[in-house]
Every structure is written in structure tokens, then in C-alpha cells.
Amino acid sequence: MALYEHVFLARQDVTSQQVESMIDTYKGVIEANGGKVEKTEMWGVKSLAYRIKKNRKAHFTLLNIDAPPAALAEMERQMRISEDILRFLTIRVEALETEPSAMMQKRDRDERKDRERGRRRDEDGFSGDRNEEN
């Protein structure tokens, strides 16, 4: 079977639970056609470079798929029909990544920086409450 990386963008007004149910639906399509989804990553809501179908933001999701081409074609057909999916892109790869993608690593790095900034504020005596001294 062929290996694929598949990214899709869901509308911004869809909830995270609805995105998870979409992922489960598309996993079911792949598995029903003889494939399997190796890894899923939800990258969260991100700004788009330009408006797509009147949306400025979208839920970004990555699926690593090991499936025959027919299974992928069926999943893409269902994505074209869905109004909640703005765009999708599927790329055939030689090997699937097992570690977190670059987007997840960037998010972890940003969260770590935010925690360090918070620690520095605490060390400087900043508590966030301006009326504490009065």
C-alpha cells in the first residue's frame, strides 16, 4: 500500500469536537477500504494567508495514511462534498514521519517560551495585580 500525508482545513466556526468527528469519519472511510491512519495531528485554528470561502481562519489537521489509492480517492470525494472542508492536500511519501511534525514542534517551542516568560515575570516580583500595593 502507498503512504500519504494528508492535510485538510475545516471552517473556523466548526468546533474542535466536530473536527474530531470528521477525523473519525474519514478514518472509517480509509479503514473500510483496506487502509489505516497511522497518525493524526490537530494543529489548531490558524490564520489563512487569504480568504477561502469567506473564512479568514481554519482548523488545520494532518493525517498520515497507509492505504490503497482507491481508499484515498473515496475519502477525497467525500471531502469535496462536505461544506465544512475548505481545502485539502494529499502528498505521496516514501516513509511516514513517526515523530511530531514541524508544526507541532513549533507549537511546543512557542508554549515553552511562554512558560519561561511567565517564570521571569514571577522572579521580578510581577504578580499581575496592580492594586496589590494599595
From Swiss-Prot:
Keywords: Ribonucleoprotein, Ribosomal protein, RNA-binding, rRNA-binding. One of its GO terms (cellular component) is cytosolic small ribosomal subunit. The keyword Ribonucleoprotein applies. GO terms for biological process: translation. It holds the Pfam family Ribosomal_S6. InterPro entries: Ribosomal_bS6, Ribosomal_bS6_sf, Ribosomal_S6_plastid/chlpt, Transl_elong_EF1B/ribsomal_bS6. PANTHER family: MITOCHONDRIAL 28S RIBOSOMAL PROTEIN S6 (PTHR21011), SMALL RIBOSOMAL SUBUNIT PROTEIN BS6M (PTHR21011:SF1). The gene is rpsF. One of its GO terms (molecular function) is small ribosomal subunit rRNA binding. Residues 105-134 have a biased composition (Basic and acidic residues). It comes from Methylobacterium nodulans (strain LMG 21967 / CNCM I-2342 / ORS 2060). This is Small ribosomal subunit protein bS6. CDD domains: bS6 (cd00473). Binds together with bS18 to 16S ribosomal RNA.
